[in-house]
């Protein structure tokens, strides 16, 4: 499994209250079936800066929740996070501090690290999105194979039927990109718009759908924001 990134290689776990769960998992996808249980265990650790808004749903009092947001528990929404109109939180979702979950974005069974952004028309299921990672408008993390078979990563069987993406800290995904089930993207890597990604992309790269280049100031633009 040498080409599959370990949890500590993708994520700085200081930027999520799911730290204890993730540190128990050598590979981050091992945490995906345990997200709901983790969230429920965290409820009793939340202080009075969180409000229980309904059964199994806790939202930081300084979070911004716009009208038209639907939240199903168990869910925790962190401090100064913004949930924009039409966001659909389907349960087993932990969103950290300072994150943005945008218009018509749908989340299910996810850990979203602090300051991550899923701001426009994104679907992210059975996934982990790292610190300050960003998915541009319409980028999708597909979590289920068409044939419903278990998902493998670089030939290694995960034993998971549903597994979307592990998106490393500071990684960027361009508009309209599709991340196939079981995708793992390294820290600070950039994915061009309209690209399909499958498997593992290492950190500090730029992927245009055909080739990987080292991330340098002269080959990085901001057109996917």
Residue ranges and their predicted role:
Residues 1-5, 41-46, 60-62, 90-99, ...:
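Phosphate-binding glycine-rich loops and adjacent basic patches that engage nucleotide phosphates
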Residues 2-7, 53-54, 70-72, 82-83, ...:
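Short, flexible segments with low predicted structural confidence
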Residues 13, 31, 75, 81-83, ...:
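Functionally constrained cores in energy, signaling, and assembly domains
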């Amino acid at each position: 499994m040498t080409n599959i990134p370990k949890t500590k290689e993708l994520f700085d776990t200081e930027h999520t209250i799911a730290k204890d769960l993730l540190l128990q998992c050598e590979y981050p996808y091992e945490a995906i079936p345990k997200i709901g249980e983790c969230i429920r265990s965290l409820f009793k650790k939340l202080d009075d800066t969180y409000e229980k808004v309904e059964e199994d749903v806790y939202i930081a009092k300084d979070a911004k929740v716009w009208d038209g947001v639907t939240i199903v528990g168990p869910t925790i929404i962190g401090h100064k996070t913004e949930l924009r109109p039409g966001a659909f939180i389907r349960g087993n979702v932990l969103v950290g501090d300072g994150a943005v979950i945008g218009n018509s974005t749908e989340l299910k069974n996810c850990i979203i690290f602090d300051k991550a952004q899923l701001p426009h028309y994104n679907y992210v299921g059975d996934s982990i999105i790292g610190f300050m990672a960003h998915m541009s408008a319409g980028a999708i993390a597909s979590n289920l194979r068409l044939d419903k078979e278990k998902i493998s990563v670089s030939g290694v069987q995960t034993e998971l039927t549903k597994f979307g993406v592990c998106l490393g800290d500071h990684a960027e995904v361009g508009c309209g990109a599709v991340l196939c089930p079981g995708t793992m993207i390294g820290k600070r890597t950039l994915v061009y718009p309209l690209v399909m990604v499958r498997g593992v992309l290492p950190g500090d790269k730029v992927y245009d759908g055909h080739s990987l280049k080292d991330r340098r100031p002269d080959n990085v633009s901001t057109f996917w924001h």
